[in-house]
């Protein structure tokens, strides 16, 4: 495995030098050269092995078998795996197995990887033309596209659920099987599948391909660039550029942030592709565009844990209010992809800002997204005070964040160490062993960080060597207290460009010790509103707010099971800090020198005085708080009154609602099996909408609650109208001059458990712009809205 892996990794890593590519300033180590040895990351890795081996490979392969015309050995898994996105987890699974095998050398993982890849190869060979995917009835859609029939929208293509996104997972799995795990046969499979795509789009114009790219397509441009990097054949680079979405790229080239309202994780993989193309082809402007995107998202659109987006979409950068109130906070997939982009930018720049973000997101979002006992994976991490997270169950849940989540915990070793011109760089303080084969050296990092504020590095070498060993100087460290020792004796380190460096002749058994004095920080939301999160070193602190009514905490296989849909605790009852910003940190005291536990004072209501905070990554199976609002004594009463009014209205509507879909948002509409004809979506000041010149429809459910009406939110000019049908029965019309419409259902539909709500064009050429559709019990609402 190791020899094959090194070949693939070196080919891809060195491909940036194929022509006028951008040079790498920092080199990361092959993940096979790093082994975790203890600590929370090692535990997460072990839990992930159990998760991977607990899945039935034949059930994951079933969609591929069906599309290849072969007899499946088992039925599809449920959830997203049998409702239109069939096979997407199979690609993630191949990537996760590849990373885990490279990271651990685990024999059972290796056997599973070999079996999965061999069965995929059997499917590809049966197809006869290089095609390999699990998209239901995929051959029909690809023939339509080949013949120029393209009907694209952000979450569909020719009436299928994002088939380009789906097939991207297969491409990525094959690439990782070769580049990461060294499986030679995967390279040929990857090239064959890429040639199939070349043939499929060969007759399409650039305009047609750009139209097709309106549908979510993952990072296909990155994959095709990688194939160019592996083969040197320019046709693949040209394909990568054709698959680069100009609607996203062009504003970034002009340093414009036009992200508001966009589906966040649709865009990040595209930007990874822009960066990969730049690295290979020397397109510095594309690299700069990727860098602008990164700084925009990290500095202006992210919360303290490193995550971004609400309800999967970028909200307005100057208004984080939805982040503080929604039960659908940052999506784990987003941070998975932001870390991939961060690694690429760090390698070509060496800028410490990238590593500071990487470390913060790794501890506080990625590590925290796995249940440390049950092993389940998290989709949304709400920032709403007093809410909670939902964990996947291995045999029931097959969301995108399960796929990327399986990969997340298989590659913790990839950024701990780096090198440049014979200099070893220690970027993160994680117990691990690095084998630097080129120099015949082994480095063992022993640490209990962040519980203990120090790390120790032991060197083993065949012969003495003079070289530099550098340790990252993180943003959170107290530089005045940093100290080094070599073999127990104080040593001097030079601080240059964000690294502490010791240069000397090293002997076998030499040990370097570094203190890591952490500082306490209060991190304000980027919109400068009065919400603060506390960090100790790189660690975000959180409060356990109890285990009250954690409904659906372990998800079932329903389409909305990934959402924490239990009661939202009233925000006016959540603790706030009463005081001033300049004294904020004085409210937080460390409880014990040996534990990462803090007590928070100056809190209202008084019952929360002295509430305990601990690392968020240790906070599980409970409601929690990450952000506290800071108010002055004078503001407190009015602020509580305002919150109470807003929460009363929200709670009333929540209690009345059985089911709801946000119009124009990808996952809510997909979860409600949206269908449409001649319909458009858009966003206005961060608010999504859908309109139609014909019709669109959703499947809605009662979920055991009484329903007697449909409530519709819309906006537009007064000239627009629409007709509303439920299960084929017209229940009324809506006029553009109104924004809220409550339409009673016929009594014969009250006891139904499912409905099709269909909105059709009325007398006007186009309907109003619709924001949301709810199935409600109308006694709680006015019928004259």
Predicted feature residues:
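Beta-strand-rich ligand-recognition modules
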Residues: 489-509, 515-529, 678-707, 711-780
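C-terminal beta-rich recognition modules with glycine/proline-rich loops and embedded aromatic residues
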Residues: 290, 355-364, 369, 373-460, ...
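Extended, charge-enriched "interface" segments that sit outside catalytic cores
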Residues: 124-125
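Short beta-strand elements bearing conserved aromatic residues within extracellular beta-rich modules
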Residues: 469, 482-484, 722-724
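Bacterial Sec-dependent N-terminal signal peptides
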Residues: 1-21
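Aromatic (Trp/Tyr) and acidic
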Residues: 21-107, 111, 142-180, 217-235, ...
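Asp-box/WD-like beta-propeller blade repeats and closely related beta-sheet repeat scaffolds
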Residues: 138-161, 187, 191-211
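Active-site-adjacent structural elements in folded domains
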Residues: 157-158, 203-210, 253-261, 321-330, ...
């Amino acid at each position: 495995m190791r020899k094959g892996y090194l070949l693939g990794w070196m080919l891809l890593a060195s491909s940036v030098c194929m022509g006028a590519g951008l040079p790498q300033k920092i080199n990361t180590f092959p993940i096979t050269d790093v082994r975790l040895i203890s600590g929370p990351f090692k535990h997460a890795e072990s839990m992930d092995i159990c998760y991977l081996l607990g899945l039935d490979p034949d059930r994951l392969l079933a969609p591929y078998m069906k599309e290849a015309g072969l007899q499946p050995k088992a039925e599809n898994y449920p959830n997203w795996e049998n409702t239109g996105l069939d096979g997407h987890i199979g690609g993630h699974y191949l990537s996760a197995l590849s990373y885990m095998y490279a990271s651990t050398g685990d024999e059972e993982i290796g056997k599973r990887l070999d079996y999965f890849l061999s069965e995929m190869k059997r499917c590809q060979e049966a197809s006869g033309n290089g095609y390999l995917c699990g998209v239901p009835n995929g051959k029909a859609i690809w023939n339509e596209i080949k013949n120029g029939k393209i009907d694209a929208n952000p979450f569909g293509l020719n009436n299928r659920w994002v088939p380009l996104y789906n097939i991207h997972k297969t491409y990525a799995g094959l690439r990782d099987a070769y580049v990461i795990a060294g499986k030679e046969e995967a390279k040929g499979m990857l090239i064959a599948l890429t040639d199939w795509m070349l043939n499929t789009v060969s007759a399409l114009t650039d305009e047609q391909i750009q139209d097709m790219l309106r549908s979510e397509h993952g990072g296909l441009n990155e994959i095709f660039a990688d194939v160019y990097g592996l083969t040197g054949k320019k046709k693949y680079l040209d394909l990568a550029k054709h698959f680069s979405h100009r609607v996203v790229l062009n504003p970034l080239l002009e340093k414009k942030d036009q992200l508001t309202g966009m589906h966040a994780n649709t865009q990040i993989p595209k930007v990874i592709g822009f960066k990969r193309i730049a690295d290979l082809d020397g397109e510095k402007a594309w690299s700069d565009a990727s860098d602008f995107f990164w700084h925009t998202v990290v500095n202006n659109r992210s919360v303290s844990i490193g995550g971004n987006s609400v309800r999967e979409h970028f909200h307005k950068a100057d208004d984080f209010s939805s982040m503080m109130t929604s039960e659908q906070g940052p999506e784990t997939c987003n941070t998975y992809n932001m870390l991939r982009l961060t690694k690429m930018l760090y390698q070509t720049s060496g800028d410490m800002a990238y590593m500071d973000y990487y470390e913060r997101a790794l501890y506080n979002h990625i590590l925290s997204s796995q249940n440390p006992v049950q092993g389940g994976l998290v989709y949304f991490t709400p920032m709403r005070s007093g809410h909670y997270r939902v964990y996947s169950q291995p045999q029931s849940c097959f969301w995108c964040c399960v796929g990327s989540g399986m990969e997340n915990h298989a590659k913790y070793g990839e950024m701990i160490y780096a090198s440049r011109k014979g200099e070893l760089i220690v970027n993160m303080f994680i117990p691990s062993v690095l084998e630097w084969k080129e120099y015949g050296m082994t480095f063992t990092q022993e640490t209990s960080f962040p519980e203990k504020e120090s790390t120790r590095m032991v060197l083993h070498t065949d012969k003495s060597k003079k070289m530099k060993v550098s340790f990252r100087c993180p943003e959170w460290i107290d530089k005045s207290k940093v100290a080094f020792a070599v073999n127990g004796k104080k040593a001097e380190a030079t601080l240059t460009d964000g690294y502490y460096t010791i240069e000397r002749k090293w002997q076998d058994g030499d040990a370097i010790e570094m203190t890591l004095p952490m500082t306490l920080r209060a991190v304000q939301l980027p919109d400068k509103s009065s919400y603060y999160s506390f960090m100790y070193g790189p660690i975000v602190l959180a409060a356990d707010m109890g285990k009250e009514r954690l409904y659906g905490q372990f998800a079932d296989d329903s389409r909305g099971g990934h959402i924490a849909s239990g009661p939202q605790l009233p925000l006016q009852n959540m603790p706030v800090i009463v005081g001033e910003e300049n004294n904020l940190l004085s409210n937080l005291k460390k409880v014990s020198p040996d534990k990462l536990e803090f007590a928070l004072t100056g809190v209202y209501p008084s019952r929360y005085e002295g509430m305990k905070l601990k690392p968020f990554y240790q906070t599980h199976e409970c409601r929690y708080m990450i952000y506290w609002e800071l108010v002055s004594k004078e503001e407190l009463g009015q602020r509580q009154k305002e919150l109470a009014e807003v929460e009363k209205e929200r709670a009333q509507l929540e209690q009345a609602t059985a089911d709801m879909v946000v119009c124009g948002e990808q996952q809510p509409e997909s979860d409600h099996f949206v269908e449409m004809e001649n319909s458009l979506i858009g966003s206005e000041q961060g608010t999504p909408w859908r309109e139609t010149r014909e019709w669109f429809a959703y499947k809605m459910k009662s979920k055991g609650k009484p329903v007697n009406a449909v409530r519709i939110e819309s906006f537009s000019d007064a000239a627009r109208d629409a007709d509303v049908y439920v299960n084929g029965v017209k229940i009324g019309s809506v006029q553009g001059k109104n924004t809220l419409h409550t339409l009673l259902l016929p009594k014969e539909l009250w006891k139904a458990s499912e409905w099709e709500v269909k909105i059709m064009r009325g007398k006007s050429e186009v309907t109003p712009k619709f924001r949301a559709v709810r199935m409600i019990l109308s006694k709680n609402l006015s019928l004259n809205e």
